[in-house]
Amino acid sequence: MRKIFLEAKGIQKSFGGVHALQGVDFKVHEGEILCLAGENGCGKSTLIKVLSGAHNADQGEVVINGHKYSNLTPQDSMREGIQVIYQDFSVFPNLTVAENIAMNWQIQEKKKLVNWKKVDEIAKSSMKNLGITLDLSLPVERLSVANKQVVAICRALLDNAKLIIMDEPTTALTSKEVAGLFEIIKKLQKKGIAVVIVNHKLEEVYDIVERLTILRNGKNVADGPIKEFDKKRFIECMTGREIETKYYRPKVENSEEIFSVKNLGRSGVFEGVSFTMHKGDILGITGLLGSGRGEIGEALFGITPPTEGEICLAGKKITIHNVHDAIQNGISYVPEDRLTQGLFLEQSIGMNTTIAAIRKYCRHFFLDYKMMRNEMVRWIKELNIAAPSPEPDIKTLSGGNQQKVVLAKWLDNSPKLLILNGPTVGVDVGSKADIHEILRKLAAEGIGIILISDDLPELEQNCNAVMIMKHGKTAGILRGDNIGQLSENLRD
């Protein structure tokens, strides 16, 4: 039986009137690989911050390696060997790989002159421990997401890590990169280092994780060996409800044509793309990284406008030179990265909801705030956004609810065509099901829906046609029950 390295007992934490953690118990054994799961807003992030000393618990205690803490500080946590790798990896983009890995060592040295040879030696040694090779002189901003993560792990090892907590480490990775990350985690385990993976995709972590702890509404709801959980039980524990798998297969053959493109292209990116959409259609676009799938959405919204081809919307030929043209013609776009492209993080939930259609709230050069607030409240209710009112900052919402706000922002513009690029990336299973239901309802109302995604189950369940992109060209369009053959058709 492995020794318990960390144990949190009866942790309670509130922010104002919101109870983020309500008597949570959590433990990690030495060298254990554990998954911490739960819907966005369940308390996972708050628990991580308590364990790292970033937040003090209102009640409860944390025991690390036999040492009891009632008010754990970041210094205490790091001294005990706890390292947290957040989704942004906390790297310095303009510094080199070596400088990032050896950063904490440089700070501890407290010297005015930097020993660059020593910095390189330390970074190289840390990478060697994991069997990894990266160009030490390369600025981190030029690395892939997966390699930025490797840099963060190497830095954690230099700080004598005994427990590494990874917050949603697979969100922005390809399946190949996920496999590479899991190989690194196995190497960490062999060195006796425990790893906590924060994740809400059971199928992704099933083969590497030993034990699973699930939180819901700030409370423990399940804990046990991973093999005791199938997908159905996992989802029910996380959401408190049963989520039925539905397949979207409407009959649209004789319905009204709402959108079409013919020989659409952008020089050097993609070419010869043609498709037609009818009322009720949800068209999926997929392909491997670099296939041109995301660039089609950006072209149709005018971010990087097409250089050739014909576009028809609602029976009318349109030209798109920029984003303004797209919006004026009734096209809306939900981007892949909501934090940097979809939201104003310093603004309220309500302002983010109405900002795209701000002109319709103007009355003689002034904003009609009463009208705006009524619409804000309507969208919160209609999209089931978990917010008490429109006034709180958007940052207070979970990822799934933030994504619903991005969706509301563009629906407030009354679009004829809605393009979504990876709309459920980093979204918990409950919010994911809600978003899918919203898209189906919109399609039934006559709004054209283009769903760009590499999540094959998402496409199979929610699209009645899927276009496959390969090397910037259309490789085929699957319809109806043939969509089940997606994985075979994606292979080169």
List PLM regions with ranges.
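Glycine-rich phosphate-binding loops of nucleotide-dependent enzymes
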Residues: 2-492
